[in-house]
Amino acid sequence: MQIKGRTVALFLLVVGFVLSCGSHSPNNRSDHSDARTDFTLDILGGSSIRFVAFGDTRFHDPSDTTPANASVRQAIVAAIDKERPTFVSISGDIVFDGDDASDWKVWDSESAAWREHHIPVFPVLGNHDLKGDHDTALANYFARFPRVEKNRFYSVRFGNCVLLVLDSSQDEVSGEQGEWLLRHLDLYANSLDFIFIALHHPPYTSSLDEKRYGGGHSARTREQSLARVLESRQPQMHARLIVFSGHVHNYEHHDHGGVTYFVTGGGGAHPYLIPRKPSDLYQDSGINYHYLMVDATPQRVRVTMNKLDIADGKQQWTQPDVVVIPGAAPVARQPISNRTFTQFSSELITRKYETDHAHSYRRRRAANGRPLETRLEGGGLPG
């Protein structure tokens, strides 16, 4: 009887332990937790990829012209739709108030054509996207972008490249996000040709905090630390590092330590004028509403700045800056196997998505009848 009693007690102890663990499992997390896991989406099917990078759209009531110029924003969104890019990377401040449902409804309406044409959007969290009630803002954000599965930072594999998306409301080079970033830089350093990094706050900018230029922001210490990490690693890497940021409502292009930096905050938010330095690689000190078209091949990346001016209701598009970034000198590249993909995750889920020639996410057969593959990497869904 004593042995039986001990067996029952041991059984109850094990059950209690399992239940307590289950209460903290990924599937039971709150929708608004700050927990995060790794996430990788593979877009296979071609060595040449075309995508758009831009930000600071501030979707909001078009009749309120203080936060943004709605006609500019709408024109840029329409122009991007006509381009039919593989995907769009938005570097934050998608809406004006993250917890305002009406702002997100403006996003729903004005970006509807992208969803109609199956253009995926890979977002970055900006300070305005988190404005107001934190939980409500995150819920609104994740509801619009289910593909990222509630991850605040994540990676997107495509062709010979990867896009690493960071949350600059948290430290980029320390803590969980910092460990994740360094791990991925190591993973892809010599196996891919280009590593793109997208975040909201810029590591480099000639903008100032002074408001005499209509507003602006200088670079923060946190992003300067990120730049030092990237530039210290670049000489030892085969992959070239390219960084897209926003927050400053203008366009900038900087090269430091072998890393190319773009500020692409000209998506419609009220513009900041920048007192350009002589060393700045782009010198137009005026208003620069724009989006960037990025063409990536194994040999080079071409970034074209598409600038919009509207006068008397007429749109004028120009391309005042075109940047060609060559691939690194040939070195012994290390192919990434499925084992390498899974070494930092608890599971590998493979899904089949059949796409059209633009690599969009329609579930239909490609011309050759073979589906493209989407691969998700992660150990459970973060809240």
Regions found by a protein language model. Give the residues of each.
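A short C-terminal boundary segment appended to hydrolase-like catalytic domains
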Residues: P26-S33, S285-L372, E377-G380
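Extended active-site neighborhood of metal-dependent phosphoesterases/phosphodiesterases
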Residues: N27-F39, I43, D64, A101-I195, ...
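N-terminal active-site segment of His-dependent metallophosphoesterases
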Residues: H24-S102, S206
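Active-site glycine-centered loops adjacent to acidic/histidine catalytic or metal-binding residues
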Residues: D56, G92-D93, G126-N127, H200, ...
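Bacterial N-terminal signal peptides that target proteins for export
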Residues: M1-A9
